[in-house]
Amino acid sequence: GDIFAHVGFNEELQASGHARLWERSREAMGSGELVMTNFVDFDMLYGHRRDPKGYGLALEEWDEELGRFLKELKEGDLLVITADHGNDPTWRGTDHTRERVPVLIHGAGAGDGGIRDTFSDVGATIGDWLGVKMDEGQSIL
């Protein structure tokens, strides 16, 4: 709930660990609802704790699961993968780091979005997919 301030979502599903989060995401697929999954282990367990080995292993497992998940998407589905900040596990200290965050958008007619100038383009793209006009940002659909 802290990511979206408990605003605009009907239900919050809890799960622990990436495997269970993927499972919960699959269960929600096809519901017609907007589903947001926060894979927080990258941040909480590996980023802030500066564990590059754990981060790398978790990323390999996550990447394999993403490949399977992509094959399950249906016509018209939209998948957006992004982050709210960087968290390089090799950097000194325990704070967030300043990398550009990835924005990967797949399905529903998404094309090559290139490098975006503003994160509000993510909101505009999701809004466009939902049929909601956004005041800020530019959709890549």
Annotate each predicted stretch with a short phrase.
Residues G1-L141:
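Feature captures the catalytic ectodomains and active-site-proximal regions of enzymes
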